[in-house]
Amino acid sequence: SLKGTEAAVSFSSGYATSLGVIASIADREDTVLMDKLSHASLIDGARLSGARLSTFLHNDMESLRKKLQHLRDANPSGGILVVTESVFSMDGDRAPLREIVRLKDEFGALLLVDEAHGFGVLGEHGAGLAEELGVSSRIDFQMGTLSKAAGVSGGYVACSRAWADVMVNSARSLIYSTAPPPALAAAALAAVEVIRSGEGKELRR
């Protein structure tokens, strides 16, 4: 409910989330188009998927448009997954999510946003940069880790029910990994409740 999606899937870590989610979405027939400064775990997830991996210049919307146009000209019906962080881990840049959403809609692509460094910090309820910019409902996959603002361990992806079912049945880093222990799951839920509460709002000021 915090992310405003139909469903969410939890993983043992943020890294496991990147691996499992991207490999569940894309395959050898698709292209993963990623911001050049995206986190290593996202790059590894794209490589594991077997999809073609391409990059666009960091936060450069003209570069993204040109790459999307080239991919659509080459394969009008090909699958494209655009990947970016919301707040970049190395330098703190914020992605221009409104522009990215417009472009992914224009070219019929899917969009994955890694909110690892936005979750718990940005937005009215701490849901992240997508919430702050009012574009959450237009992002196909919002993923992140619980090891930053939430202060625990684990990862998540928030998406449609249909895509969540795909991941539960195909994400190898989920299926073949031990689930978080009950104490950790309870701590994560408590942290999320603090983030979305009035106390969390005060702490973000």
Please describe what each predicted stretch is:
Residues 21-40:
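Conserved PLP-anchoring active-site segment centered on the Schiff-base-forming lysine
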Residues 54, 58-113:
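Active-site phosphate-binding strand-loop segment of PLP-dependent enzymes
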